[in-house]
C-alpha cells in the first residue's frame, strides 16, 4: 500500500504553519517537515510542502501515478472540481481527467485536525489502549475545535471513542492563554521562549491570583474560557527587513495593551513567565482530572500544540495519576500528516499493533537520505 498524506490541505485557501508530508510504502515510512528542507521555519508565501513531497517520491522510489491513497485534513469548504483537476491531473498526473471523479471518490481521504493529532500520538506510542487529550490554539478552519478528548483502543473497530470536545465558539482556551502570555512578553508566537524565560523567574502569588481571574469555569459544558480584551495593533511596514522577513512582525505590534498587560504591568518578565506557566500547569491538570474522572485507563496520551511545552509535560507526568503518560515527538501540527497516514493504514487493516519503527520509534522526523556527493554539492 502506498499513501501520501499532506498537511495543510494544498487546495484550501487558509494560512497554516508547520507544513509537512508523510508517505508510506508498505512498511517504509517517510515523514518530514517542509521547513527542514527550505532552511526557513516560517514562509508565509507557501501553500503546501512541495519539497518534502518530491523528496519523498525520491526516497521511497515511487511516483504520483502509483499512489493508492491521498490523505488531507478536512477542508474549510468544498473544493472546486477544477482545482482538483489541476492538482491531480495537470500537476501530479496521478490520473486522467476522464477518471478524476472516480479517483476523488475512491482515493482521496479526509481526516479532521484534532483526530489527526490523536492518531499521531496513539500510533507513535506503544500503547494498545489509552485515554487521550488534544489541546491547541484552535485547530484549523476545517476543524474549529480547541480541545478533544476520549479513549483510543486498537481492538475497537472505530478505534477512537470521544468523551467530549470544545469548539472555538465557546471562547478562548488555555492554548490561547499561553499565546497571549507569549505575545505580552514580546515573543510574538514563539511560545518556547516563554517557557525558557520561566526557568529564571519566581512564583508571585498575587499575580497568580489575578491571572486566574481571567478564566471563567463552566464544567457542565466541559469548558474553561480565557478572557483578555486587547487593543488594536499597528502595522510597521517601515521596519521591514527583507533578509529576516516574517509577516507577523510587521502586521502587528507586540505586545499590545490588554487586560493581561495591565495585570502584569509592575512585575518582572521572568516572574510573569514563571507564574503564568505554573497557572497553565494547574489548569491543565485540573481539566484532565475533570474530563477523565470516571476513567479506569492506566495510560494517558497528550497531543496538540499545547504539549510542545516540556515543563508542562513533566508536570503532567508527575501529577496526572496515570501509570504511564506519553507525549509524541511532535505533538503540534508538524506531526499531523503522520497521524492521518497511520490512521488510514490502520483502517485498511495494515496495522495490527503499535510497533516501534526502529530505535527512534514512529515519528515525523523520518526524512530524506543524502549520499556523500549530494552533501558536497549542497556545501560547495
Regions found by a protein language model. Give the residues of each.
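Short acidic/glycine-rich loops and adjacent helix/strand connectors
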Residues: 1-380
Amino acid at each position: 500500500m502506498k499513501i501520501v498524506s499532506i498537511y495543510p490541505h494544498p487546495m484550501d485557501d487558509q494560512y497554516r504553519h508547520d507544513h509537512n508530508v508523510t508517505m508510506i510504502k508498505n512498511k517504509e515510512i517517510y515523514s518530514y517537515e517542509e521547513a527542514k528542507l527550505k532552511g526557513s521555519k516560517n514562509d508565509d508565501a507557501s501553500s503546501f510542502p512541495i519539497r518534502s513531497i518530491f523528496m519523498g517520491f525520491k526516497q521511497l522510489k515511487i511516483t504520483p501515478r502509483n499512489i493508492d491513497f491521498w490523505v488531507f485534513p478536512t477542508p474549510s469548504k468544498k473544493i472546486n472540481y477544477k482545482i482538483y483537476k489541476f492538482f491531480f491531473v495537470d500537476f501530479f498526473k496521478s490520473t486522467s481527467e476522464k477518471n478524476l471523479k472516480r479517483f476523488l471518490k475512491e482515493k482521496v481521504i479526509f481526516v479532521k485536525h484534532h483526530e489527526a493529532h490523536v492518531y499521531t500520538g496513539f500510533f507513535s506510542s506503544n500503547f494498545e489502549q489509552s485515554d487521550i487529550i488534544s489541546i491547541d490554539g484552535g485547530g484549523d478552519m476545517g476543524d474549529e475545535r480547541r480541545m478533544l478528548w476520549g479513549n483510543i483502543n486498537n481492538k475497537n473497530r472505530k478505534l477512537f471513542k470521544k468523551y467530549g470536545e470544545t469548539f472555538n465558539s465557546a471562547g478562548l482556551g488555555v492554548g490561547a492563554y499561553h499565546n497571549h502570555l507569549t505575545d505580552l512578553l514580546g515573543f510574538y508566537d514563539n511560545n518556547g521562549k516563554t517557557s525558557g524565560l520561566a526557568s529564571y523567574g519566581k512564583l508571585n502569588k498575587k499575580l497568580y491570583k489575578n491571572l486566574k481571574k481571567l478564566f471563567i469555569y463552566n464544567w457542565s459544558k466541559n469548558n474553561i474560557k480565557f478572557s483578555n480584551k486587547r487593543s488594536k495593533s499597528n502595522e510597521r511596514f517601515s521596519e521591514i527587513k527583507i533578509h529576516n522577513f516574517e509577516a507577523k512582525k510587521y502586521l502587528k505590534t507586540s505586545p499590545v495593551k490588554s487586560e493581561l498587560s495591565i495585570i502584569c504591568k509592575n512585575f518582572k518578565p521572568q516572574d510573569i513567565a514563571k507564574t503564568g506557566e505554573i497557572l497553565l500547569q494547574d489548569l491543565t491538570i485540573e481539566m484532565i482530572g475533570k474530563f477523565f474522572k470516571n476513567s479506569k485507563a492506566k495510560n494517558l496520551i497528550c497531543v496538540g500544540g499545547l504539549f510542545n511545552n516540556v515543563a508542562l509535560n513533566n508536570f503532567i507526568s508527575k501529577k496526572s495519576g496515570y501509570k504511564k503518560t506519553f507525549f509524541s515527538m511532535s505533538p503540534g501540527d508538524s506531526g499531523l500528516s503522520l497521524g492521518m497516514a497511520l490512521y488510514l493504514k490502520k483502517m485498511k487493516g495494515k496495522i495490527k499493533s503499535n510497533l516501534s519503527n526502529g530505535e527512534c520509534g514512529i515519528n515525523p522526523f523520518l526524512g530524506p537520505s543524502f549520499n556523500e556527493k549530494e552533501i558536497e554539492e549542497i556545501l560547495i
